[in-house]
Amino acid sequence: MPKKNSPLLPKETTPTQSSVDTSGSSNLTWPVSEHTIRRPLWARLLGQILDPWLDLSIEPEHCVQYPEHCVQYNDGRPIIYVLEDYGLCNTLILDKACRKTKLPSPLIPLPGNPLQRKRAYLALSRRSSSNSLIPNQRGGKTHSDSLANLLQAHRIRDTLDVHLVPVSIFIGRTPDRQSGWFAVLFSENWALVGRFRRLLAVLLNGRNTIVCFAPPISVRQTLNEGLPPERTLRKLQRVLRAHFRRIRETVIGPDLSTRRLLVDNVLATEAVREAIASQAKRDGTDLSETWRKAQAYAWEIAADYSSPVIRSADFLFSHVWNRIYAGVLIHHVDSFKETAPGHEVVYVPSHRSHIDYLLLSYCLYQCGIVLPHIVAGINLNLPIVGTLLRKCGAFFIRRSIKGNMLYSIVLSEYVAQLVAGGYSLEYFIEGGRSRTGRLLQPKGGMIMMTLQAFLRQPRRPVLFQPIYIGYEKLIEGTSYLDELSGEPKKKESIWRLFWNIPKVLKQKYGQVVVNFGEPIALNDVLAELAPEWEGQALNENEKPAWLSNTVNHLARQIQTRINSAADVNPINLLALALLSTPKHAMGEADLIAQITLCKKILLELPYSNRVTVTPHTPERIIAHAEQINILTRVHHPLGDVLRVDGDNAVLLSYFRNNVLHLFTASAWVACCFKNNRRISRIALIRLGVGMYPFLQAELFLPWTEDQFAQHIQQVIELFVREGLLLSAGDEEEDPLTRNTSQTDEVFRLRAISHSLQQAFERYYITISILVKNGPGTLSASELESLCQLAAQRLSLLYASTAPEFFDKGLFRGFIQKLRELNLVWPDTYSKLLFDERLDTSAKDAQVILGRELRHTIERISPEATKPAPK
């Protein structure tokens, strides 16, 4: 920036008095030296009070390059300063800047008083009269009559030629971190703030104030364009506003606080206006009443982005994360930053905790990435909390919008405005937090809105960025246990939030890892699935035949990419090992050996190049789990036993499920030897490929069937090297065998198999109930309910299981896959039909499940209640 002695500064000359013709017959120049007419007493007194708090950096032209032939400030013509908005602090700062640069004072009126005010400055907008600490962005700006009076004075007096000098004032543009969060909160931004807030800004950040003088604008030249009076006024106001906006963008960055503008644009769209008219006609109400309802919806939804609040939140949460977490690790963000420029970015993270919202925003901010507009459930729109989340970029949507067409269209148009405006987005396609640790089946609503918005205005290419968030301990762990035990979900409450904050701050939650997955370019997806689309914009109501399929493909691809960027932390490895035993306990040596085997599988047979694995040794992993109170050590003369007690065992199933997909192939191979001592390679691979579509649908696996077969082959080779299996040869027909005795190798093989055991039990329950009831008896929903009941009963009779074992959603996914593969299909009454192929699948289960377990499942499989004969 130019310094005080910069050539851009006006020459240090003092205006001198010249003759004035009050009739307007002579050329008007600056009339009186400041030494002749003193500034008002109140200005001198307040200026002395404010001076110690101010340190001005003067920028006559700032960083915008203007032509060298611009009229200088001291050419003798009268000057009127133009501020962006009124305010006593602004007036005193301007006066000090003028004295510092030897320019005429804004507090001394011009001869003839063309402004009809006792001053030589005007403002485009009035500052809010509110004394609130919160910036007023909804209140409208009101322009003064001074500019209109000045133009009228020029029309009356032909020789009058006043120059307007726009002056931009920025208090606390970039306060240092050492200044504290309170100073950051009151730094300069785009909001029109009240008097009290401006005063606090001066007291806290006044020593970092920038005053930007722009080149003068000749009012006479503007009038000489010959436009009608109203158009001249509007044009001059528009030019000045554009100037102030350009300077503000240069100094403090672009305006992201566009809530009012977005709401106005949403309500002005053709789709919303038609929806308002349709709703009013349907309800028999007045158009204005329905319009107000649509406006209320828009304000309920819209974010209220505020840079000072975001900077304050960063300052606050830096301390919070350091207190409760042992670090936040971010992987693969550099490759994302190389790919993202020029794209409309949509962040699509996994959803495990309410902390996801805050944590990801914190990580992006720390990486120097502009925060996105984040979709949040309306349940989080709590007093105080909701306001803060809005100001950090959150916009709120209702959980269910079915049947509310007006709300649906307002929401859709709001998203379209964000996409068209180039704002990045963030939403969780699972719809809600996963209570089981698995990725939930995706919901395509937000993807559909994003895709439709892009197709309407395909300006910038869209990039979906999958993100995996991994925790070692959940803040919501206790509430998840209650919900999985059958208790209803507790409604979010501001009081419960405040009550829980001290408890949370006393706990240690281990380390958090944020992994950026491989991004998905929307244009590449459209080129594959919609080759007939050639980049042309579509109409609002146009829905091509390929749209729904594209949304579904995108949703599954996002979940698959999230899983392909998983992080394996110490708790994941402990969960895989300990939950494979009946009492969730192992000797220390056995636990170390099992963790070592799991790490070897991950490192020697990498799932993808974005999966990260903890570098800690098994011994360090065990010590870490003891530190955060997950493991209990029981001392014994024959060797210590490490176990998980009570609720921790159920919570560990959550962390096992986080990484279940990484061990799919190895768990499949191990499962085949749980109840069989010998099996050929070709049979093992054939059965695995037959089971793969169901595993892929449930776990979002990335391979094709051929790739999965190759992965199984690699697992077999690793198990042979580790001594877990014995091979009679390398041919497909050659048998693979395991030891008959209860060796350490057999123990480790059984432990690996346990992670997929419950999935196969669910599959067999579904097939058993279908076969027992016969074709044409059960609908899909009836089958789901019976499967859930059978799984609950099996859990009570046979062995304790994790709560997700009888999750209806998992059964629903399996039944849906059966339908996709045409193994079952509905009749005209929506009852499921099947043929002998289902019996073949049941026979294949004999390879995986033991005889006793199969018999128990067949015995408890319920039959549908048949209606009593008439």
UniProtKB/Swiss-Prot annotation:
SMART domains per record: PlsC
Region (Disordered): 1-27
GO BP annotations, alphabetical order: CDP-diacylglycerol biosynthetic process; fatty acid metabolic process
Polar residues bias (residue ranges): 13-27
HXXXXD motif (motif): residue ranges: 351-356
UniProt KW rRNA-binding keyword: no
CDD domains with a match to the protein in the record: LPLAT_DHAPAT-like
Subcellular location: Cell inner membrane
Pathway annotation from the record: Phospholipid metabolism; CDP-diacylglycerol biosynthesis; CDP-diacylglycerol from sn-glycerol 3-phosphate: step 1/3
EC code: 2.3.1.15
GO cellular component entries: plasma membrane
Keywords (A to Z) from UniProt: Acyltransferase, Cell inner membrane, Cell membrane, Lipid biosynthesis, Lipid metabolism, Membrane, Phospholipid biosynthesis, Phospholipid metabolism, Transferase
Pfam families given in the database record: Acyltransferase (PF01553), GPAT_C (PF19277)
GO MF annotations in UniProt: glycerol-3-phosphate O-acyltransferase activity
Membrane topology type: Peripheral membrane protein
Main location: membrane
Annotated SUPFAM superfamilies: Glycerol-3-phosphate (1)-acyltransferase (SSF69593)
Catalytic activity: sn-glycerol 3-phosphate + an acyl-CoA = a 1-acyl-sn-glycero-3-phosphate + CoA
NCBIfam families: plsB, PRK04974.1
Xref: HAMAP family: Glyc3P_acyltrans (MF_00393)
Listed PANTHER family: DIHYDROXYACETONE PHOSPHATE ACYLTRANSFERASE (PTHR12563:SF17), GLYCEROL-3-PHOSPHATE ACYLTRANSFERASE (PTHR12563)
Family: Belongs to the GPAT/DAPAT family.
Domain-level remarks: The HXXXXD motif is essential for acyltransferase activity and may constitute the binding site for the phosphate moiety of the glycerol-3-phosphate.
Protein name as it appears in the record: Glycerol-3-phosphate acyltransferase
